[in-house]
A protein has these predicted regions:
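Surface-exposed, charge/polar-rich loops and edge strands
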Residues: 1-225
Length: 225
């Protein structure tokens, strides 16, 4: 689909805001309402780009976040721009026939520092966060294979995590050595330092299917199902 308009002073996002309709999950069984622009949104959302809110995060109020902070629990915010594929039902008989859309992510350097401080153990809020965090491991693996990789080279393909050689613990083997989560995150931090960047921008098509070995996420807070 190709979009064009004749007023360069108007951004595409402004056009979408003016004539578009906020997509809401089909299971709500109703039309979009004007109030959805504020209520169908997490309290910590900051960057426009997703076609849908990460619904697990809707249960976190400012008070809940304050209570988490009061208990000394480290928390970090990551960005994954949820794509239209989130509304795409699985129609194929086998999971191999389902194609994931590419989604763009942004992760701050301090998030890598926090992960390393906690030995790369994390509780993810929603599968959106899971896809982001687990993609980081495989991006770090790419840097273990090629330290000179460019930003576009870090993209994680849908079945890449399953096609790479793994040891019995599920760690990817590069050469004759298994890459731990801490090493993968360390590679990403070093790459950011070398590039003099504070934020990693990349993309992923990762799919979490039966048989997947989690590298960073060991707990998941998900939405009501």
């Amino acid at each position: 689909v190709d979009f064009s308009w004749d007023d360069d002073s108007v951004a595409f996002a402004e056009i979408l805001d003016a004539i578009g309709e906020l997509p809401i999950p089909p299971y709500l069984n109703r039309e979009t309402e004007e109030t959805d622009k504020t209520t169908y949104q997490t309290v910590y959302s900051k960057i426009k780009g997703s076609v849908a809110a990460p619904t697990a995060g809707l249960h976190f109020t400012q008070k809940v976040l304050a209570d988490i902070d009061a208990h000394g629990i480290d928390r970090e915010e990551v960005t994954l721009h949820v794509g239209a594929g989130t509304f795409k039902p699985v129609k194929s008989e086998e999971i191999e026939g389902h194609a994931m859309h590419t989604e763009y992510i942004a992760v701050r350097r301090q998030t890598f520092e926090k992960l390393l401080a906690h030995e790369c153990h994390a509780t993810a809020v929603g599968t959106t966060s899971v896809r982001t965090l687990e993609s980081l491991y495989y991006m770090g693996v790419k840097l273990a294979m090629n330290p000179d990789a460019q930003e576009e080279d870090l993209h994680v393909n849908q079945w890449e995590p399953y096609d790479l050689p793994h040891n019995e613990e599920g760690l990817v083997i590069v050469g004759d050595k298994a890459v731990t989560a801490a090493e993968a995150i360390g590679h990403l931090r070093h790459w950011l330092d070398a590039a003099k960047l504070d934020v990693l921008h990349s993309s992923t098509q990762i799919i979490i299917a039966p048989g997947y070995t989690y590298q960073i996420v060991d707990k998941l807070i998900t939405n009501f199902h």
